[in-house]
């Protein structure tokens, strides 16, 4: 029996820990909606970071809306018109622009990123962002959805389609093709989404272990991607893909004040032949916030991903293997440091 690959075992451990990360969300019926202001107008959920808001609509309807509204009011509402936005306090209104309406295809982690970076925060003293659990406060609207902001309906099938599109796009960024996704057996591809819906990591891993490469750094690693996996199941076994050998890392940087998302080519290996670190990426694309000359690179701002502070020496290839979202993308939020 072949001995287990230490890199694979460690990667699976970190992927499972990332999978288990969750966000506490407080959901309140928006002012002016039927049932708002009564004793049953708020509901709390513990939402996995990898999940999506449309998956929680049945639970929210049963445990919030059906308790807050009477039968006549329930007959007048349509779930297709529901939408969420982050609740903003009077103090926060004086700060950066908030995320507003939450898009249906955003993973919960991205909703949390936008919420966290919307105001300057003190630099965490450890990898924990806060000593007390954070709660995202969302308002539930039952009508008049802002279609120009939401972009798509809250259908689970539409959400699944958008997730799959992101999976393919991430694969293309890595290898300049989508062969690893398109060559998957249908049962493995469906297992990825079913794992998300059913909160089953092992089911999800049935897909992700076949398309997201391991952080294998060897002397043979280069910036040139390896050949795509063969579609012939009878072919000879192929060495595991390395995230250090990909063309680029599926990588997005989110900024406060609803600034445009930064999505550039991020190679796993720098021109000097050394692994690309997160700090190096930030210094290239945000030099004013992360100046090269600074003794404390996180003095003005700091990066977060999956709810934790990311160390400056973290290699982006490792992050892409162990801390990426369920669609394969690394999402880093940049938060300004509080004075």
From Swiss-Prot:
Record field: compositional bias (Low complexity): 219-230
CC per GO annotation: Atg12-Atg5-Atg16 complex; autophagosome; phagophore; phagophore assembly site membrane
Subcellular location: Preautophagosomal structure membrane
GO biological process terms, semicolon-separated: aggrephagy; autophagosome assembly; cellular response to nitrogen starvation; mitophagy; piecemeal microautophagy of the nucleus; protein transport
Main location: membrane
Membrane topology value: Peripheral membrane protein
Covalent link Glycyl lysine isopeptide (Lys-Gly) (interchain with G-Cter in ATG12), residues: 168
UniProt PTM: Conjugated to ATG12; which is essential for autophagy.
Keywords: Autophagy, Isopeptide bond, Membrane, Protein transport, Transport, Ubl conjugation
Quaternary organization: Conjugated with ATG12.
Cited function: Involved in cytoplasm to vacuole transport (Cvt) and autophagic vesicle formation. Autophagy is essential for maintenance of amino acid levels and protein synthesis under nitrogen starvation. Required for selective autophagic degradation of the nucleus (nucleophagy). Also required for mitophagy, which eliminates defective or superfluous mitochondria in order to fulfill cellular energy requirements and prevent excess ROS production.
Protein family: Belongs to the ATG5 family.
UniProt name for this protein: Autophagy protein 5
Organism: Cryptococcus neoformans var. neoformans serotype D (strain JEC21 / ATCC MYA-565)
